[in-house]
Protein backbone atom coordinates (compact mmCIF):
# COMPACT_ATOMS: atom_id res chain seq x y z
CA UNK A 1 0.00 0.00 0.00
CA UNK A 2 1.55 3.27 -1.13
CA UNK A 3 0.46 6.35 0.84
CA UNK A 4 1.50 9.76 -0.44
CA UNK A 5 1.20 13.23 1.06
CA UNK A 6 2.49 16.78 1.19
CA UNK A 7 2.00 19.22 4.09
CA UNK A 8 -1.03 17.29 5.31
CA UNK A 9 0.00 16.10 8.77
CA UNK A 10 -3.46 15.99 10.32
CA UNK A 11 -5.18 14.10 7.54
CA UNK A 12 -2.28 11.79 6.69
CA UNK A 13 -2.45 10.43 10.23
CA UNK A 14 -6.09 9.47 9.63
CA UNK A 15 -5.30 7.96 6.24
CA UNK A 16 -2.41 5.98 7.70
CA UNK A 17 -4.60 4.62 10.48
CA UNK A 18 -7.08 3.35 7.90
CA UNK A 19 -4.23 1.33 6.38
CA UNK A 20 -2.90 0.06 9.68
CA UNK A 21 -6.39 -1.03 10.74
CA UNK A 22 -7.02 -3.22 7.70
CA UNK A 23 -8.64 -6.57 8.54
CA UNK A 24 -6.11 -8.16 6.16
CA UNK A 25 -3.00 -7.80 8.30
CA UNK A 26 -0.17 -9.04 6.06
CA UNK A 27 0.52 -5.76 4.27
CA UNK A 28 3.43 -3.48 3.46
CA UNK A 29 2.81 0.25 3.92
CA UNK A 30 5.15 2.59 2.04
CA UNK A 31 4.56 6.21 3.06
CA UNK A 32 6.16 8.64 0.62
CA UNK A 33 6.33 12.28 1.68
CA UNK A 34 6.79 14.87 -1.05
CA UNK A 35 9.25 17.02 0.94
CA UNK A 36 6.74 18.47 3.41
CA UNK A 37 7.55 21.50 5.54
CA UNK A 38 4.98 20.72 8.25
CA UNK A 39 5.04 17.82 10.73
CA UNK A 40 3.96 15.16 8.21
CA UNK A 41 7.30 13.33 8.29
CA UNK A 42 7.32 13.23 12.09
CA UNK A 43 3.79 11.79 12.07
CA UNK A 44 4.84 9.06 9.66
CA UNK A 45 8.10 8.25 11.44
CA UNK A 46 6.36 8.04 14.82
CA UNK A 47 3.89 5.54 13.37
CA UNK A 48 6.72 3.55 11.77
CA UNK A 49 8.40 3.17 15.15
CA UNK A 50 5.25 1.45 16.41
CA UNK A 51 4.41 -0.58 13.32
CA UNK A 52 7.18 -2.48 11.47
CA UNK A 53 4.97 -2.77 8.38
CA UNK A 54 5.50 0.96 7.68
CA UNK A 55 8.43 2.27 5.65
CA UNK A 56 8.88 6.04 5.32
CA UNK A 57 10.49 7.66 2.30
CA UNK A 58 10.99 11.44 2.02
CA UNK A 59 11.66 12.98 -1.39
CA UNK A 60 14.57 15.44 -1.48
CA UNK A 61 12.52 18.15 -3.20
CA UNK A 62 8.85 18.80 -3.73
CA UNK A 63 7.61 17.41 -7.03
CA UNK A 64 4.41 19.46 -7.15
CA UNK A 65 2.16 16.49 -7.86
CA UNK A 66 1.31 12.87 -7.15
CA UNK A 67 3.35 11.11 -9.84
CA UNK A 68 6.86 11.24 -8.34
CA UNK A 69 5.89 9.98 -4.87
CA UNK A 70 3.73 7.21 -6.30
CA UNK A 71 6.44 6.12 -8.73
CA UNK A 72 8.96 6.07 -5.89
CA UNK A 73 6.56 3.92 -3.91
CA UNK A 74 6.32 1.45 -6.79
CA UNK A 75 10.13 1.29 -6.92
CA UNK A 76 10.35 0.51 -3.20
CA UNK A 77 7.47 -1.97 -3.02
CA UNK A 78 8.38 -5.59 -2.37
CA UNK A 79 4.84 -6.96 -2.00
CA UNK A 80 3.28 -8.85 -4.95
CA UNK A 81 0.35 -6.42 -5.14
CA UNK A 82 0.15 -2.63 -5.11
CA UNK A 83 -2.54 -0.18 -3.98
CA UNK A 84 -2.49 3.61 -3.67
CA UNK A 85 -3.91 6.00 -1.07
CA UNK A 86 -3.89 9.81 -0.89
CA UNK A 87 -3.37 11.63 2.40
CA UNK A 88 -6.83 13.24 2.40
CA UNK A 89 -8.74 9.97 1.90
CA UNK A 90 -9.18 6.63 3.69
CA UNK A 91 -9.65 2.97 2.91
CA UNK A 92 -12.59 0.88 4.04
CA UNK A 93 -11.43 -1.54 6.74
CA UNK A 94 -11.92 -4.58 4.50
CA UNK A 95 -10.56 -3.01 1.31
CA UNK A 96 -7.37 -5.06 1.09
CA UNK A 97 -9.16 -8.29 2.02
CA UNK A 98 -11.83 -7.79 -0.63
CA UNK A 99 -9.47 -6.67 -3.39
CA UNK A 100 -6.80 -9.26 -2.62
CA UNK A 101 -9.35 -12.07 -2.56
CA UNK A 102 -10.73 -10.93 -5.91
CA UNK A 103 -7.43 -10.43 -7.74
CA UNK A 104 -6.15 -13.86 -6.69
CA UNK A 105 -9.36 -15.81 -7.34
CA UNK A 106 -9.98 -14.07 -10.67
CA UNK A 107 -6.33 -14.38 -11.75
CA UNK A 108 -6.68 -10.77 -12.89
CA UNK A 109 -3.99 -8.19 -13.61
CA UNK A 110 -5.97 -5.61 -11.66
CA UNK A 111 -9.28 -5.37 -9.84
CA UNK A 112 -11.51 -2.31 -9.51
CA UNK A 113 -13.44 -1.73 -6.28
CA UNK A 114 -16.13 0.85 -5.67
CA UNK A 115 -15.17 4.31 -4.42
CA UNK A 116 -17.47 6.33 -2.19
CA UNK A 117 -17.30 10.06 -2.91
CA UNK A 118 -17.95 11.98 0.31
CA UNK A 119 -18.64 15.73 0.33
CA UNK A 120 -17.35 16.59 3.79
CA UNK A 121 -19.08 19.93 4.27
CA UNK A 122 -22.54 18.62 3.29
CA UNK A 123 -22.39 14.96 4.29
CA UNK A 124 -23.46 13.91 0.80
CA UNK A 125 -22.23 10.42 -0.16
CA UNK A 126 -22.31 8.85 -3.60
CA UNK A 127 -20.77 5.75 -5.16
CA UNK A 128 -18.52 6.71 -8.07
CA UNK A 129 -19.83 5.15 -11.31
CA UNK A 130 -22.23 2.74 -9.55
CA UNK A 131 -23.30 1.17 -12.85
CA UNK A 132 -19.88 -0.49 -13.08
CA UNK A 133 -20.18 -2.12 -9.67
CA UNK A 134 -23.58 -3.80 -9.70
CA UNK A 135 -22.09 -7.32 -9.61
CA UNK A 136 -18.80 -9.20 -9.54
CA UNK A 137 -17.41 -9.29 -13.07
CA UNK A 138 -14.27 -10.29 -14.96
CA UNK A 139 -13.54 -8.70 -18.34
CA UNK A 140 -11.12 -10.04 -20.92
CA UNK A 141 -9.48 -6.68 -21.47
CA UNK A 142 -10.81 -3.14 -21.90
CA UNK A 143 -12.63 -3.86 -25.16
CA UNK A 144 -14.98 -6.18 -23.26
CA UNK A 145 -16.18 -3.19 -21.19
CA UNK A 146 -15.16 0.24 -22.55
CA UNK A 147 -17.25 1.78 -19.77
CA UNK A 148 -14.31 1.13 -17.46
CA UNK A 149 -12.83 4.32 -18.94
CA UNK A 150 -15.29 6.22 -16.76
CA UNK A 151 -13.35 4.98 -13.71
CA UNK A 152 -9.79 6.20 -14.15
CA UNK A 153 -8.90 7.02 -10.55
CA UNK A 154 -6.01 4.84 -9.37
CA UNK A 155 -6.85 4.57 -5.68
CA UNK A 156 -9.79 2.14 -5.77
CA UNK A 157 -7.83 -0.62 -7.46
CA UNK A 158 -5.32 -3.37 -6.72
CA UNK A 159 -2.56 -4.13 -9.24
CA UNK A 160 -0.17 -7.01 -9.62
CA UNK A 161 3.26 -5.46 -9.09
CA UNK A 162 4.78 -7.75 -11.72
CA UNK A 163 2.14 -6.61 -14.24
CA UNK A 164 3.06 -2.93 -13.71
CA UNK A 165 6.79 -3.58 -13.99
CA UNK A 166 6.64 -5.91 -16.99
CA UNK A 167 4.61 -3.34 -18.91
CA UNK A 168 6.67 -0.36 -17.73
CA UNK A 169 3.57 1.37 -16.38
CA UNK A 170 4.17 4.38 -14.16
CA UNK A 171 2.63 7.79 -13.52
CA UNK A 172 3.56 10.60 -15.96
CA UNK A 173 6.04 13.06 -14.50
CA UNK A 174 5.18 16.73 -14.08
CA UNK A 175 1.47 16.48 -14.88
CA UNK A 176 -1.67 16.65 -12.78
CA UNK A 177 -4.56 14.23 -13.46
CA UNK A 178 -1.91 11.54 -13.74
CA UNK A 179 -4.39 8.84 -12.67
CA UNK A 180 -6.15 8.97 -16.01
CA UNK A 181 -3.16 8.06 -18.19
CA UNK A 182 -1.84 5.53 -15.67
CA UNK A 183 -5.18 3.74 -15.43
CA UNK A 184 -5.71 3.78 -19.20
CA UNK A 185 -2.31 2.12 -19.71
CA UNK A 186 -3.25 -0.51 -17.12
CA UNK A 187 -6.59 -1.20 -18.79
CA UNK A 188 -4.97 -1.48 -22.23
CA UNK A 189 -2.22 -3.84 -21.05
CA UNK A 190 -4.45 -6.06 -18.90
CA UNK A 191 -5.74 -9.37 -20.22
CA UNK A 192 -8.11 -9.82 -17.26
CA UNK A 193 -9.76 -6.95 -15.35
CA UNK A 194 -11.90 -7.70 -12.31
CA UNK A 195 -14.66 -5.56 -10.83
CA UNK A 196 -16.25 -5.97 -7.40
CA UNK A 197 -19.27 -4.20 -5.86
CA UNK A 198 -17.76 -3.61 -2.42
CA UNK A 199 -16.78 -0.07 -1.44
CA UNK A 200 -13.03 -0.03 -0.87
CA UNK A 201 -12.12 3.68 -0.90
CA UNK A 202 -13.50 6.78 0.78
CA UNK A 203 -12.82 9.72 -1.54
CA UNK A 204 -13.17 12.95 0.44
CA UNK A 205 -13.99 16.26 -1.24
CA UNK A 206 -15.01 19.69 0.03
CA UNK A 207 -17.43 21.59 -2.15
CA UNK A 208 -16.96 25.34 -2.48
CA UNK A 209 -13.60 25.58 -0.71
CA UNK A 210 -10.44 27.20 -2.01
CA UNK A 211 -8.01 24.86 -0.24
CA UNK A 212 -9.14 21.51 -1.58
CA UNK A 213 -7.04 18.86 -3.28
CA UNK A 214 -5.44 19.25 -6.70
CA UNK A 215 -8.39 17.75 -8.54
CA UNK A 216 -10.81 20.03 -6.72
CA UNK A 217 -9.13 23.39 -7.56
CA UNK A 218 -10.37 23.80 -11.11
CA UNK A 219 -9.69 27.51 -11.71
CA UNK A 220 -5.93 27.30 -11.87
CA UNK A 221 -4.44 27.58 -15.35
CA UNK A 222 -2.14 24.61 -14.77
CA UNK A 223 -5.13 22.41 -14.02
CA UNK A 224 -6.66 23.25 -17.38
CA UNK A 225 -3.43 22.86 -19.37
CA UNK A 226 -2.49 19.60 -17.64
CA UNK A 227 -5.93 18.11 -18.18
CA UNK A 228 -5.64 18.92 -21.89
CA UNK A 229 -2.12 17.43 -21.99
CA UNK A 230 -3.26 14.22 -20.27
CA UNK A 231 -6.15 13.84 -22.69
CA UNK A 232 -3.78 14.30 -25.63
CA UNK A 233 -1.52 11.57 -24.23
CA UNK A 234 -4.55 9.32 -23.79
CA UNK A 235 -5.56 9.99 -27.40
CA UNK A 236 -2.08 8.89 -28.49
CA UNK A 237 -2.46 5.63 -26.57
CA UNK A 238 -5.80 4.98 -28.28
CA UNK A 239 -4.79 6.03 -31.80
CA UNK A 240 -5.35 2.62 -33.36
CA UNK A 241 -8.50 1.81 -31.38
CA UNK A 242 -11.36 4.07 -32.57
CA UNK A 243 -14.00 2.16 -30.61
CA UNK A 244 -12.22 2.98 -27.36
CA UNK A 245 -11.58 6.58 -28.45
CA UNK A 246 -15.34 7.06 -28.57
CA UNK A 247 -15.75 5.83 -24.98
CA UNK A 248 -12.88 8.01 -23.78
CA UNK A 249 -14.30 11.09 -25.51
CA UNK A 250 -17.74 10.39 -24.09
CA UNK A 251 -16.23 10.37 -20.61
CA UNK A 252 -14.43 13.65 -21.29
CA UNK A 253 -17.62 15.33 -22.49
CA UNK A 254 -19.82 14.01 -19.70
CA UNK A 255 -17.43 14.54 -16.79
CA UNK A 256 -14.40 16.73 -17.37
CA UNK A 257 -15.76 19.28 -19.82
CA UNK A 258 -18.88 19.73 -17.71
CA UNK A 259 -16.71 20.50 -14.68
CA UNK A 260 -15.00 23.36 -16.46
CA UNK A 261 -18.14 24.73 -18.07
CA UNK A 262 -19.81 24.77 -14.66
CA UNK A 263 -16.83 26.60 -13.20
CA UNK A 264 -16.62 29.04 -16.12
CA UNK A 265 -20.26 30.07 -15.94
CA UNK A 266 -20.09 30.21 -12.16
CA UNK A 267 -17.37 32.84 -12.15
CA UNK A 268 -18.28 36.29 -10.99
CA UNK A 269 -17.61 39.26 -13.26
CA UNK A 270 -13.95 40.23 -13.21
CA UNK A 271 -12.67 36.79 -12.21
Language-model-detected regions and their locations in the chain:
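Nucleotide-sugar donor-binding/catalytic module of glycosyltransferases
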Residues: 1-236, 240
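Amphipathic alpha-helical repeat scaffolds of TPR domains
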Residues: 251-262
Amino acid sequence: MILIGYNDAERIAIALNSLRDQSFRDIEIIAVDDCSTDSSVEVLQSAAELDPRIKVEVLSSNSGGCSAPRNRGIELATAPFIMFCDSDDTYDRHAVRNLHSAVTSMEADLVVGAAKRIVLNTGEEKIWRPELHATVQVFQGLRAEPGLLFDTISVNKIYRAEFLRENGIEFPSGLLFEDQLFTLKCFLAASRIGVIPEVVYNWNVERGTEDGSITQSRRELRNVSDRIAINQLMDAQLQSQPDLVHAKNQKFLEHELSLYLTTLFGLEEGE
